[in-house]
């Protein structure tokens, strides 16, 4: 799972680097576990842009990932390690003893042919899923549920890992990749180990077209716009923003302004905010 760098054959390859894909052994997904994805270009049901700088991109099929890991007590065998265009982590096609096949996130160190298991009695090895109450302190975990039975919601990106640092009562204390320390019910399931493809953050797109393949459109800086279009715009030549604080195109404070609601139910479960928050 290394990174391949290009020589400067063209301006686009001068600073370009991509994943080697050496761990992938299958190019086409399991057809029964895929579905169509409709593109919305960042627009809502009325056609209004609600998320800017989105559109285009390569056509994708969605892979149905088993984040719940609710097939308990049934051994599974890793058949393939595959590329998933919808995430930067790799996925594994798993065949269970009863004949069912499911996709799961690829855990670092899991190889083709390995056995995995989900349930309270599963051994503590990468790829197995257990309730937090059955996982020892100090263990690295990922794909963590926030509510029992809802499926993993956090720590799912490539190379991410959380650590169990304490348990008290019905809650476990986790240190998340962002530096946040959070309480999670011990009945929640988590997968042992670290998410694979740890070099995902070391890739360099190298050219604008690579960003367009991902469905990301150009971002125009507000300081180069007209004053009618953005609060930072206007002025003669290269002018500063002319405000005490940076503002969004709609005049709201940004770049450091906290946007998280204090009325969220989980506010009391966060013991320490994430870094730079």
From Swiss-Prot:
It comes from the Eukaryota. It comes from Spirogyra maxima (Green alga). This is Large ribosomal subunit protein uL2c. The lineage of its organism: Eukaryota, Viridiplantae, Streptophyta, Zygnematophyceae, Zygnematophycidae. The keyword Lipid biosynthesis does not apply. One of its GO terms (molecular function) is rRNA binding. NCBIfam families: rplB_bact (TIGR01171). Residues 24-33 have a biased composition (Basic and acidic residues). Gene3D superfamilies: 2.30.30.30, Nucleic acid-binding proteins, Ribosomal protein L2, domain 3. Keywords: Chloroplast, Plastid, Ribonucleoprotein, Ribosomal protein. The keyword Ribonucleoprotein applies. One of its GO terms (biological process) is mitochondrial translation.
């Amino acid at each position: 799972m290394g990174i391949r760098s290009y020589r400067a054959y063209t301006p686009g390859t001068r600073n370009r680097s991509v994943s080697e894909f050496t761990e992938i052994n299958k190019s086409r997904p399991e057809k029964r576990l895929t579905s169509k994805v409709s593109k919305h270009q960042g627009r809502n049901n009325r056609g209004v842009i609600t998320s800017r700088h989105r559109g285009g991109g390569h056509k994708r099929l969605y892979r149905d990932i088993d984040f719940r890991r609710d097939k308990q007590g049934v051994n599974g065998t890793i058949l393939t390690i595959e590329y998933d265009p919808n995430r930067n982590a790799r996925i594994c096609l798993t065949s269970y003893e009863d004949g069912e096949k499911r996709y799961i996130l690829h855990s670092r160190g899991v190889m083709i042919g390995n056995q995995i298991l989900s349930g309270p009695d599963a051994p503590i090895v990468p790829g197995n899923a257990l309730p937090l109450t059955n996982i020892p302190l100090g263990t690295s975990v990922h794909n963590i549920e926030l509510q029992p039975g809802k499926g993993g919601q956090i720590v799912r990106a490539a190379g991410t890992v959380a650590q169990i640092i304490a348990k008290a009562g019905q809650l476990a204390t986790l240190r998340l990749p962002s530096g946040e320390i959070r309480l999670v019910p011990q009945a929640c399931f988590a997968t042992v180990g670290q998410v694979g493809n740890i070099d995902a953050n070391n890739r360099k797109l190298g050219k604008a077209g690579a960003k367009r393949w991902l469905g990301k459109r150009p971002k125009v800086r507000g300081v180069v716009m007209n004053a009618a279009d953005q609060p930072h715009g206007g002025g003669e030549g290269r002018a500063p923003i002319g405000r005490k604080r940076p503002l969004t195109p709609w005049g709201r404070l940004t770049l450091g302004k906290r946007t998280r609601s204090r009325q969220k139910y989980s506010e009391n479960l966060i013991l320490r905010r994430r870094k730079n928050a």
